[in-house]
């Protein structure tokens, strides 16, 4: 099983821009076009393509943001955007990619926690995150989404 997390570059940008979620998921996450624009405006964001067996199957965006965190004085590590392309959903890739992303972020940032935010009606995603140990911490982000945190 080959999983790779690759930065968005000129070589894969067009393919990344072609990724999309299903129609019923559009209200939960921004398009890759919007994500890449956000990353251009905010240097904390690191957009990446998610590859399985050489195929681009998803997208994520993460970063170390300069908010106070009791265990990391440099800030909080956020998994800000994450999705599997509609064409690859229902094949267990969400679990595989989330596991790889958690490991990647833990190694990259040497962090003790990973944060994310989610709309409370995104039940499928909440269940996935809970299976991987993410729990609601009582906070809301600036968009009113509920914050979840995973202790590493």
From Swiss-Prot:
Acetyl-CoA binds at residues 82-84, 89-95, 122-131. It comes from Bacillus subtilis (strain 168). Putrescine and N(8)-acetylspermidine are competitive inhibitors of spermidine acetylation. It catalyses: an alkane-alpha,omega-diamine + acetyl-CoA = an N-acetylalkane-alpha,omega-diamine + CoA + H(+); spermine + acetyl-CoA = N(1)-acetylspermine + CoA + H(+); spermidine + acetyl-CoA = N(1)-acetylspermidine + CoA + H(+). Belongs to the acetyltransferase family. Acetylates both spermidine and spermine at primary propyl amine moieties, with spermine being the preferred substrate. This is Spermine/spermidine N(1)-acetyltransferase. Its EC number is 2.3.1.57. CDD domains: NAT_SF (cd04301).
């Amino acid at each position: 099983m080959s999983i790779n997390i690759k930065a968005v570059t000129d070589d894969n940008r067009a393919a990344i821009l072609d990724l999309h979620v299903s129609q019923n998921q559009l209200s939960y996450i921004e398009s890759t076009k919007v994500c890449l624009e956000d990353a251009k405006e905010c240097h904390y964001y690191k957009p990446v393509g998610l590859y399985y067996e050489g195929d681009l199957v998803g997208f994520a965006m993460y970063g170390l943001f300069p908010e106070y965190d009791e265990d990391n004085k440099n800030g909080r590590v956020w998994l800000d955007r994450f999705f599997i392309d509609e064409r690859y959903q229902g094949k267990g890739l969400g679990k595989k990619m989330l596991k790889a992303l958690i490991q990647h972020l833990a190694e990259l940032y040497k962090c003790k926690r990973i944060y994310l935010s989610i709309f409370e009606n995104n039940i499928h995603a909440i269940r996935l995150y809970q299976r991987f140990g993410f729990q609601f911490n009582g906070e809301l982000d600036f968009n009113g989404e509920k914050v979840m945190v995973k202790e590493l």
